[in-house]
Design a protein with these regions (language model features):
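Mid/C-terminal beta-alpha module of Rossmann-like enzyme folds, strongest
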Residues: 149, 165, 172-217, 223, ...
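NAD(P)-dependent short-chain dehydrogenase/reductase
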Residues: 98-153, 161, 167
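NAD(P)H-binding glycine-rich loop region in Rossmannoid oxidoreductase-like domains
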Residues: 1-39, 50-52
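Conserved Rossmann-fold NAD(P)-dependent oxidoreductase catalytic core, especially the SDR/UDP-sugar
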Residues: 45-81
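SDR active-site strand-loop-helix element
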Residues: 17-21, 58-64, 68, 106-108
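C-terminal amphipathic/interface module of NAD(P)-dependent oxidoreductases
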Residues: 222-261
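Glycine-rich NAD(P)-binding loop of the Rossmann-fold in SDR/ketoreductase-type enzymes
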Residues: 1, 31, 35-46, 80, ...
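Conserved catalytic-site region of short-chain dehydrogenase/reductase
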Residues: 60-73, 85-88, 111-115, 129
Length: 261
């Protein structure tokens, strides 16, 4: 969003740019629309200008949040119908990226992964937010009970898997829009139960509630599971939730064993 930063990118002359920058807090976007637009849309517009000037590829990380959640297993060409301001900004940023000849839009959802205490301590206040997986695991480790919604479905995606998807897609020189998630469609409640089971915590600490009981500020789509068959047909390997949790278990067992029961 700052011209001086754009100039620095131009001086580097990259072969490609990966745009992971976004305000993703749905309620925050609904409350602070001007700032959210600046980061999510204006920032993307600036990167598009840079890529046009340098003739380099732009990889845009997008979201399931552009859909309204009323259909099953969304494909790339299904009509976007965002139900909140966050989704609207991400859709507008996608449309900006499509003005380029060489672009890659990767739609993902519910990104999660392990974040060490040292990493969290070094972050700014906003970035101290963790992710659904870390929140659930930390609460269970402290023997706290959790109320989790049972009517919001998506494909939880391990961030390390998305990283590999990005670079595999670059190697194959993919162009266009692709759904890029882990392949298990699951509710938040069931996801939390799977975390408890994998890491050895009592599942009875987790009880289910409906989204209405949360009284969230911004509306949420209910079921935004993505069909990833297009990217799989292009030779990109995807993972199940069980495979991803197994991978995380090994990492945490080595890095932070206190998080395992």
């Amino acid at each position: 969003t700052k011209p001086e930063n754009c100039e620095k990118i131009i001086q580097i002359k990259p072969d490609f740019i990966i745009n992971t920058s976004a305000i993703t807090d749905v309620d925050y976007c609904e409350k602070f629309k001007e700032q959210s637009y600046l980061v999510n849309v204006t920032g993307t517009k600036n990167l598009v200008k840079i890529c046009k000037k340098l003739e380099c590829k732009l990889i845009q990380i997008s979201t399931d949040g552009i859909f309204n959640g009323k259909e099953e297993n969304y494909k790339e060409d299904d009509e976007p119908k965002p139900v909140n301001y966050y989704g609207k900004t991400k859709l507008e940023s996608e449309n900006e990226v499509k003005n380029l000849n060489d672009y890659l839009i990767l739609r993902t959802n519910l990104l999660y992964g392990y974040i060490s205490k040292n990493t969290l301590a070094s972050r700014s206040t906003y970035l101290k937010r963790t992710n659904f997986f870390m929140w659930v695991l930390t609460e269970l480790q402290q023997n706290n009970s959790l109320k989790i919604v049972n009517d919001q479905f998506s494909n939880p995606t391990l961030v390390d898997n998305l990283k590999k998807i990005i670079f595999d897609s670059l190697k194959k020189n993919l162009v266009g829009t692709f759904h890029s998630t882990d392949i298990t469609c699951i509710s938040r409640f069931s996801f939390a139960k799977e975390i408890a089971k994998k890491f050895g915590f009592p599942e009875h600490l987790i009880t289910e509630i409906s989204s209405k009981e949360l009284d969230q500020y911004a509306p949420r789509p209910t079921k935004t599971c993505l069909d990833c068959s297009k990217i799989q047909k292009n030779g990109i390997n995807l993972h199940t939730l069980d495979e991803s949790l197994d991978s995380l278990f090994k990492v945490i067992q080595k890095e932070d064993p206190k998080l395992i029961s």
